[in-house]
């Protein structure tokens, strides 16, 4: 059985509202289109004003938000609360970027920026919006993690660290909200073709970090994630984790079966 995106209350239809960050393209945009088809009122969070206007023209409610800016997150949260009349059903924390390069080339400021966008911003936004969810006894909080939240590889230590943090945070939040009716899920994509690579910061341009060949062969489009996102939002029993792509499944199995040194050799290439 699934939840419907609308409820009948006192003779009126109330549309359930969800906020999606990182909505300008890729996983965020595809998920927004699908949840809109499912009947949700989608608040589409974007970092650039032009993208906010584009979301409005597509039938969404555009919200300007930069997760790297605490002030922007606060303003966006206030706007979402006002737009939903303090009644929000779901949050899809999807925005983020990758800081790639050997750890020896990454400064403290760069590491802080990686965590600010991928982790601290999602924490701040979720905590600001929880009061608009808790009184209603139901809801969904969905996080875009990554296969890099399960493993780390050379050149991706900063990005993986931010996703490891997101995994631990989501596990704790899920247990803390266990009696609230709000369910917490993690989406764990492997290699996905999106504009994410446009937002990758390379710390050594002469030695760029590239997708290994085996990952490139199993890269899927963002639509591969959409079914998982839909299930997380409308199923009465959403999963705690949704692995996406063969690469993620393989990593989960190999981590359980192989000694750490063997995994290191595989991941080092």
Curated annotation (Swiss-Prot):
One of its GO terms (biological process) is steroid metabolic process. Belongs to the short-chain dehydrogenases/reductases (SDR) family. PROSITE patterns: ADH_SHORT (PS00061). It comes from the Bacteria. GO terms for molecular function: alcohol dehydrogenase (NADP+) activity; oxidoreductase activity. It holds the Pfam family adh_short. The gene is ybbO. It is an enzyme of class 1 (oxidoreductase). InterPro entries: NAD(P)-bd_dom_sf, Sc_DH/Rdtase_CS, SDR_fam. This is Uncharacterized oxidoreductase YbbO. Keywords: Oxidoreductase.
